[in-house]
């Protein structure tokens, strides 16, 4: 009995061409997505600055997301503190106002 390996399936030129085309499309889509990501993350975009590598792009994006999450958390804490101060001032203001009766 003849053993059929994976390489036999790739022997047909049409199959190999189809696989190659699919891989080229996949890589094109990946590179386009990375270019889109590079366009929105903050880094030097000057003409003399080299394009970021794939890994550098992903790491920079990850760090940017972490920084944004921390900023949101800090702002949320500040908003809570300001709300409490505002409520305290309103209560103080109410307690200092003479009754209208």
UniProtKB/Swiss-Prot annotation:
InterPro entries: bHLH_dom (IPR011598), bHLH_transcription_factors (IPR050359), HLH_DNA-bd_sf (IPR036638). Residues 28-68 are annotated as: Helix-loop-helix motif. Residues 14-27 are annotated as: Basic motif. The keyword DNA-binding applies. GO terms for biological process: axon development; positive regulation of synaptic transmission, dopaminergic; positive regulation of transcription by RNA polymerase II; sensory organ development. Residues 14-68 form the bHLH domain. Expressed in neuronal tissues of the head, including sheath cells of the cephalic sensilla (CEPsh) glia. It is found in: Nucleus. Probable transcription factor that regulates the expression of dopamine receptors dop-1, dop-2 and dop-3 and thus dopamine-dependent behaviors. May act redundantly with hlh-31 and hlh-32 to regulate ventral CEPsh glia functions. May play a role in chemotactic responses in larvae. This is Helix-loop-helix protein 17. It comes from Caenorhabditis elegans.
């Amino acid at each position: 009995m003849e053993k059929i390996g994976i390489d036999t399936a790739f022997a047909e030129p049409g199959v190999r061409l189809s696989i190659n085309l699919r891989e080229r499309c996949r890589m094109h889509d990946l590179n386009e997505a990375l270019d889109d990501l590079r366009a929105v993350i903050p880094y030097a975009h000057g003409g003399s600055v080299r394009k970021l590598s794939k890994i550098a792009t992903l790491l920079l994006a990850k760090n940017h997301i972490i920084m944004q999450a921390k900023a949101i958390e800090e702002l949320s804490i500040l908003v809570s503190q300001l709300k409490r101060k505002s409520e305290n001032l309103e209560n103080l203001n109410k307690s200092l106002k003479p009754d209208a009766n």
